[in-house]
């Protein structure tokens, strides 16, 4: 079998309901391709008749029969499909959300005890295997955990599940083991491509879950690195402390926490950054967009900034990197009519250059501008238009920054206005066509994005190296 496709570059943030501005749970993750690769994406709705009853992986020899009662769910699969589905993020008709996966690290002690399974499951498969069949975030943990125990996995991953009440984060351990923690309601979680959970209580199944034999597994292979008087730290046992982590991973957690807890002074290379923190104020959708667009603004590590040196500007991997494929914020809101409680905010391409667009998820179709992405470059879809804007604006980022900021603010304001207007209509007893509302939002964003592309192209053309100030 050919070498498996792996996407090592995602960044995740999770926001508990008491830490969010509106009492919602928010799960967000960038899906980033490997260096030198770009993966076109699309957003679709998978209806029960389109869900496979027997699933076969492309990346491994894994196959499995699936239940005959799938729910409808949204999905953000690879647009071309040649490497498998890679559904990545979605919300089902029970308003349960799933984001999969955040590739994470492990260590040789774990892999020696429970090797990865070449015929197991991976990121390609997980949303398709789990999301259509779960009615709570906790059910998602238990279903995926059972599949991991039975079939194994060929890679180490972190997976988020959410509903109106809870967010759960599951991390795989070796080939067949797993551990999961409920995100505290008043906290947020930052998770780059590292094993993250740093506290676990085996006697508290309300907030902590794991594979049935995990404690025996830890004892048998001497994986617990904490002293007897300390709480068990899964990150020490199952994670990594590599030089690469301090360049590629820990700085991303640091910059997110620096924005959400500016009063806490930390080292970007520290292995002791907390998995979860209570923010200094409540977190908004705009905050989530900002941290997932981060390129270390206001530090010497910003590749676009005026501080620092040529070396420092390239030392850490930005969150808002060039090879982001898509970013989804899965926003499950309380005290709303069920048909509009779940919102999936979508962005394509490099995050410093794009916007987040809200969609109602209890629908049968997604607007073509977001659903029809081709292999060739066209400006009639959101993915390629965003890719063009980023490539054109990057060489002169500071020149284009005001236009990018205005576009972001205006389009997200329109999104909030749309959400509020629909809620008012429903509460007044009016009938609302949610697919039509999604289409109107898509049409508006298409117009604004085309206008931005026109402006960026014009300005970039005037900044070309071969420009000359004299003309006839």
Swiss-Prot record:
- Signal peptide: which range, if any? none
Molecular-function annotations in GO: cysteine-type exopeptidase activity; dipeptidase activity
User: Which EC class does it fall in?
Assistant: hydrolase
InterPro entries registered for this protein in UniProt: C69_dipept_A-like, Peptidase_C69
Reactions listed under catalytic activity: an L-aminoacyl-L-amino acid + H2O = 2 an L-alpha-amino acid
Active site per UniProt: 10
EC number(s) reported in the record: 3.4.13.19
Biological process according to GO: proteolysis
Superkingdom, taxonomy of origin: Bacteria
For this UniProt record, give its keywords in alphabetical order, as a comma-separated list. Answer: Dipeptidase, Hydrolase, Protease
Q: Name one Pfam family in it.
A: Peptidase_C69
- What is stated as this protein's family in its record? Belongs to the peptidase C69 family.
> What name does this protein carry?
Probable dipeptidase A
The organism is Streptococcus pyogenes serotype M1
The encoding gene: pepDA
């Amino acid at each position: 079998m050919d070498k498996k496709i792996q996407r090592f570059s995602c960044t995740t943030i999770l926001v508990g309901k008491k830490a969010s501005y509106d009492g919602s749970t928010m799960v967000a993750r960038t899906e980033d391709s490997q260096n030198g690769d770009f993966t076109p994406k699309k957003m679709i709705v998978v209806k029960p008749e389109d869900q496979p009853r027997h699933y076969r992986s492309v990346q491994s020899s894994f196959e499995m029969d699936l239940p005959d009662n799938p729910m409808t769910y949204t999905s953000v699969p690879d647009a071309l499909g040649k490497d498998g589905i890679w559904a990545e993020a979605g919300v089902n008709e029970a308003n349960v959300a799933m984001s999969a996966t955040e590739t994470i690290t492990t260590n040789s002690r774990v892999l020696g005890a429970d090797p990865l399974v070449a015929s197991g499951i991976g990121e390609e498969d997980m949303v398709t295997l789990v999301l259509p069949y779960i009615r709570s975030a906790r059910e998602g943990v238990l279903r995926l955990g059972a599949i991991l125990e039975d079939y194994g996995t060929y890679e180490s991953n972190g997976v988020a599940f959410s509903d109106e009440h809870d967010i759960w984060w599951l991390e795989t351990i070796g080939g067949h083991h797993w551990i999961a923690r409920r995100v505290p309601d008043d906290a947020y979680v930052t998770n780059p491509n590292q094993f993250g959970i740093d506290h676990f209580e085996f006697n508290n199944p309300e907030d902590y879950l794991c594979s049935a034999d995990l404690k025996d597994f830890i004892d048998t292979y001497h994986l617990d690195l904490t002293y007897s008087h300390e709480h068990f730290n899964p990150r020490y046992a199952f994670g990594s402390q590599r030089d690469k982590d301090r360049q590629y991973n820990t700085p991303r957690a640091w910059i997110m926490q620096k924005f959400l807890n500016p009063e806490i002074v930390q080292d970007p290379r520290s292995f002791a950054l907390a998995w979860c923190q209570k923010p200094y104020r409540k977190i908004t959708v705009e905050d989530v967009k900002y941290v997932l667009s981060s390129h270390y603004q206001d530090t010497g590590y910003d590749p676009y900034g005026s501080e620092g040196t040529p070396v420092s500007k390239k030392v850490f991997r930005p969150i808002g990197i060039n090879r982001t494929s898509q970013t989804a914020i899965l926003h499950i809101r309380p005290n709303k009519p069920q048909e509009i409680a779940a919102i999936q905010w979508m962005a394509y391409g490099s995050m410093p250059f794009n916007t987040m667009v809200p969609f109602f998820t209890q629908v049968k179709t997604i607007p073509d501008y977001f659903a029809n992405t081709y292999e060739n470059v066209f400006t009639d879809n959101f993915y390629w238009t965003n890719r063009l804007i980023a490539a054109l604006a990057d060489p002169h980022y500071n020149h284009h920054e005001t236009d990018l900021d205005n576009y972001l603010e205006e389009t997200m304001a329109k999104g909030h206005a749309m959400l509020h207007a629909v809620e008012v209509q429903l509460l007044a007893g009016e009938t609302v066509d949610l697919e039509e509302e999604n289409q109107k939002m898509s049409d508006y964003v298409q117009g604004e994005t085309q206008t931005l592309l026109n402006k960026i192209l014009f300005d970039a053309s005037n900044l070309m190296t071969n420009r000359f100030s004299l003309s006839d």
